Regions:
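Conserved Rossmann-fold NAD(P)-dependent oxidoreductase catalytic core, especially the SDR/UDP-sugar
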Residues: 3-44
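Conserved beta-loop-beta element that borders a ligand/cofactor-binding pocket
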Residues: 21-22, 54-79, 140
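Flexible, glycine-rich beta-alpha linker
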Residues: 26-27, 41-45, 69-88
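Active-site helix of classical SDR
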Residues: 45, 49-52
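Glycine/proline-rich active-site loop of Rossmann-fold NAD(P)-dependent oxidoreductases
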Residues: 51, 64, 76-92, 102, ...
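Non-catalytic, hydrophobic alpha-helical segments
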Residues: 122, 126, 142, 154, ...
């Protein structure tokens, strides 16, 4: 998809391409929060593909003469996010499970650390990057570096916000999951005027209220897992969601 977009941009003489990469580009690092100058070490095909899209865009920019910005949003959450997908969007998954009367599922001991970006705080920096000449050719993290939270604590926070007396279920870790992953917002503050205006509690509350309004759903498995082995999480094999 990325290659098709970049090719269309070149063919149609688009002056600037804004590429949304992913924090998955960083992989496992010795330093947190992740800064844009760290050597990427993606741990999964998604992260590898995102990094490849950045590199492809830079090459095409050099050849075809358009400007580009690589934005690196991380863990975007908000109302209208798909919440019946059992594989991604941990906040929405937990809320949907709890509203269906089921406890949240936590992989491993839940000590994995993340930051979550409310969609309202992500939109403005993206728009700003379109017009900001200082951002041209740059890779810029988009999202907060406040409210760092473990997945275990996240599950209890969501339970508290929903006034639920359920307890999390802890299952085996997922393979290739990065343990500590959160990004510095210093560069986006400097170049794009990034500012966190919606904290994690408020963001979770917005999502929960929206899911309550439209109604919780059963999780949908659209495709079977291509290759099963001993490392495939039991939650995926047995469709525990």
């Amino acid at each position: 998809i990325s290659m098709a977009v970049f090719t269309a941009a070149a063919e149609n003489k688009v002056p600037k391409v804004i590429n949304c990469s992913s924090m998955a580009r960083y992989g496992e690092q010795d330093i947190t929060p992740f800064t844009e100058d760290l050597l990427p070490k993606p741990q999964d095909p998604y992260g590898i593909a995102k990094l490849a899209s950045e590199q492809t865009l830079e090459v095409m920019s050099n050849v075809h003469g358009f400007d580009f910005v690589n934005l690196v949003p991380h863990n975007i959450i908000g109302p209208r996010q798909k919440y019946d997908d059992p594989y991604r969007n941990v906040v929405s998954i937990m809320i949907n499970r709890i509203l269906n009367g089921n406890p949240p599922i936590v992989y491993g001991d839940g000590s994995q650390e993340r930051c979550f970006s409310d969609i309202e705080d992500v939109v403005n920096p993206i728009i700003e990057s379109i017009h900001n000449e200082k951002a041209v050719g740059e890779t810029i993290n988009i999202g907060p570096d406040e409210d760092v939270i473990s997945i275990k604590d996240l599950s209890y926070k969501i339970l508290k916000i929903l006034s639920s007396d359920l307890e999390p279920i802890f299952v085996d870790p997922r393979p290739q999951e990065v343990k500590i992953a959160h990004c510095s917002a210093d560069k986006s503050r400097k170049l794009l005027g990034y500012d966190t205006t919606v904290n994690l509690d408020a963001s979770i509350t917005k999502i929960a209220n929206w899911i309550i309004e439209v109604g919780p759903k059963k999780f949908r498995y659209h495709l079977d897992i291509e290759i099963l082995n001993e490392k495939t999480p039991k939650t995926w094999k047995d469709r525990m969601f």
